[in-house]
Amino acid sequence: MTSQMESDVVVVGAGPGGSATAAHLARRGLHVTLLEKVTFPRDKVCGDGLTPRAVKQLIRLGIDVSEEAGWKHTEGLRIHGGRIAPFVLPWPELADYPNFGMVCRRTVLDERLARHAESQGVALVEGVNVTDPILDPSGRIRGVRTSDGTEYSAPVVVAADGNSSRLGLAM
C-alpha cells in the first residue's frame, strides 16, 4: 500500500546544499521535507575544508562556528607538493567574510547541518531511496516516490542528491 506525505517543498539529499536549502525555506515558514538515502552519521570523500565564504554561509544559517562548538579554524590554505616546503596562503582579508576558514569531517558537518535543519522545523527522513519523480498529467513534477512506494508530494521539488543525481537526471 502506498502512503503519501505532503509538504510545501521536498528536498532530496541532506548534504550541505540540501540541508541549507531546507533550513532556509523552513525559517521562512514553509513546510519542508528533507529526504536522505542513508542514515547519519555518514562519510563522504572530501577534503573537509571550508573557505571563509563557506563559513559565512554557516553563520547565515545560524550555526555556531566557534572553536568552543568544536570547529577547527584555519588561517589559510596550506600547500604541500613537489619539492617545495609546505607553506600557507592566508585567507584574504575581506570585510564581508570572516577572517578564518574551518576544517570539519564530512561525517560531522553533514549531520550537524541536517540536525540544524530539523531544529528549524524541517521533517528529516533518513534511509529513504528516492527512485523517481512523480509527474502530473501535464508532465509537471509534483513530488517523488521512494523504493518502498511512499510518495512525497509538493509543488516544489529540489534535487540536491549530489553530483550523480539520479533525480536531477530524471527531471
List where the protein language model places each region:
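Predominantly flavin-linked oxidoreductase catalytic cores and closely associated redox partners
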Residues: 116-171
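Short phosphate-binding/catalytic loops that engage adenosine nucleotides
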Residues: 30, 63, 122
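Glycine-rich FAD pyrophosphate-binding loop
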Residues: 26-46
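Beta1/beta-strand and adjacent pyrophosphate-binding region of the FAD-binding site
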Residues: 2-15
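A conserved beta-strand/loop capping segment in the N-terminal third of enzymes
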Residues: 55, 60-111
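N-terminal Rossmann-fold NAD(P) dinucleotide-binding loop
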Residues: 18-19
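Conserved N-terminal glycine-rich FAD pyrophosphate-binding loop of Rossmann-like flavoproteins
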Residues: 39-61
